[in-house]
């Protein structure tokens, strides 16, 4: 194979290689002959279509497919021959001839010795208690609450329907009329100064509150200012919670309406949530230790920038879902994610390197268990499992996640670690 490699940066390489023309022509010829035997074309007997006709119809497509396959095969062979380990996908450009190509790519940095036994990891532990189940049932009751209007003053837990307008200096917001809304006192949805000011307010009562708006507030006219907010309680309502009876239990999918089965199902769901939260805590803990130990290692610049752009894309999507205009996000906003992206790339490459050096293999049993766990959150688990198994992209994502968790566990088991006992609520507060 004709191939040469050169360094164009600390972690960037340029690979120049030539495709074997004879192999390409052999593959194209073989594929065209196969099509001549199997293709049905009006006016010709099966298997008797002239090669020229086949080439006219399919030659360009067959050659393009053969070129693409041989290009990938030749590139992969050259990478193995030169013992290169790529960080990200290559950019492959046409060379001087139709069979010459130049691939530019980044390689995994040299981490030197990776001794995970020097890391110090805090491993959180927690369990689901009866009190946690009781709290979840109370939360479910709150979800099904109804509101009963009252004539007394508003207190914590009450729903207050409001009309408001604000005065910021000489500017009134809105310029005409009022804004309407509602808030449950104590929920933290509104500023503390407003919530406290609403306490004791009765239906129809009005009040003016002095409110300090933060500098980053989304309404420029209010940001960083002390504003006079005029509020009127249109209605005050207290919550009425349903009894935990058979009908209530059945509404959450327990057909028997049995209270013990209801609690057992809640325990299963909470334990699943807890397992995920503890893994996220461990992933973050191990990641922070790896970053501290290997922050001096240079990361592939293009890989970091791609990660930063991916993080920005996630933020833009969040902005869009919130109803705001994603066009307000600056085009170069990804620069603000570069530090976080570099850390994420560092951890990802290190996890892959630990797996490679220690010959860690994906555990199919763990993949199956994780898939069943995911599927159990849906009404038709078997359909979800089938969907994953029939979708290579979904399965690849699942396998990558499981492999990462295996490596995180492997590192944590060998690192210096201490256990930290947490309550369920503290554990899931990641």
From Swiss-Prot:
The keyword 4Fe-4S does not apply. Pfam families: Trigger_C, Trigger_N. It is found in: Cytoplasm. Residues 157-242 form the PPIase FKBP-type domain. One of its GO terms (cellular component) is cytoplasm. Involved in protein export. Acts as a chaperone by maintaining the newly synthesized protein in an open conformation. Functions as a peptidyl-prolyl cis-trans isomerase. Belongs to the FKBP-type PPIase family. Tig subfamily. This is Trigger factor. The lineage of its organism: Bacteria, Pseudomonadati, Pseudomonadota, Gammaproteobacteria, Lysobacterales.
């Amino acid at each position: 194979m004709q191939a040469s490699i050169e360094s164009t940066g600390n972690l960037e390489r340029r690979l120049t290689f030539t495709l074997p023309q004879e192999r390409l022509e052999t593959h194209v010829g073989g594929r065209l002959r196969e099509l001549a035997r199997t293709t049905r074309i009006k006016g010709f007997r099966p298997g008797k279509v002239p090669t020229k006709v086949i080439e006219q119809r399919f030659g360009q497509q067959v050659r393009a497919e053969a070129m693409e396959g041989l290009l990938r095969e030749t590139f992969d062979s050259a990478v193995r021959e030169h013992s290169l380990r790529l960080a990200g996908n290559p950019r492959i450009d046409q060379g001087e001839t139709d069979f010459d190509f130049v691939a530019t790519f980044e390689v995994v940095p040299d981490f030197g010795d990776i001794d995970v036994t020097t890391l110090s990891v805090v491993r959180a532990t927690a369990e689901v208690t009866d009190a946690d189940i009781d709290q979840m049932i109370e939360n479910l009751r709150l979800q099904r609450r109804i509101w009963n209007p009252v004539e007394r003053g508003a207190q914590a837990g009450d729903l207050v329907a409001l009309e408001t307008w604000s005065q910021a200096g000489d500017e009134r917001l809105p310029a005409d009329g009022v804004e309407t809304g509602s808030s449950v006192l104590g929920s933290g949805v509104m500023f503390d100064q407003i919530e406290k000011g609403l306490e004791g307010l009765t239906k129809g009562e009005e009040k003016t509150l002095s409110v300090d708006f933060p500098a980053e507030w989304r309404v420029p006219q209010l940001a960083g200012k002390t504003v006079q907010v005029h509020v009127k309680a249109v209605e005050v309502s207290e919550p009425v919670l349903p009894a935990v009876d058979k009908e209530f239990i059945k509404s959450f999918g327990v057909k028997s309406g049995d209270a013990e089965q209801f609690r057992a199902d809640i325990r299963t769901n909470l334990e699943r949530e807890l397992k995920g939260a503890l893994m996220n805590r461990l992933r973050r803990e191990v990641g922070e230790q790896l970053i501290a130990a290997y922050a001096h290692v240079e990361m592939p610049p293009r890989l970091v920038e791609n990660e930063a752009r991916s993080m920005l894309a996630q933020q833009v999507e969040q902005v869009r879902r919130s109803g705001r205009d994603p066009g307000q996000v600056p085009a170069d906003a990804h620069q603000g994610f570069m530090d976080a992206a570099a850390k994420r790339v560092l951890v990802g490459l290190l996890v892959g390197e630990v797996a490679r050096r220690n010959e860690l293999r994906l555990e199919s049993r763990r993949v199956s268990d994780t898939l069943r766990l995911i599927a159990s959150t849906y009404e038709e688990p078997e359909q979800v499992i089938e969907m994953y198994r029939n979708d290579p992209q979904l399965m690849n994502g699942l396998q990558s996640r499981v492999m990462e968790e295996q490596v995180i566990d492997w590192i944590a088991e060998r690192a210096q670690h201490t256990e930290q006992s947490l309550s369920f609520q503290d554990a899931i507060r990641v």
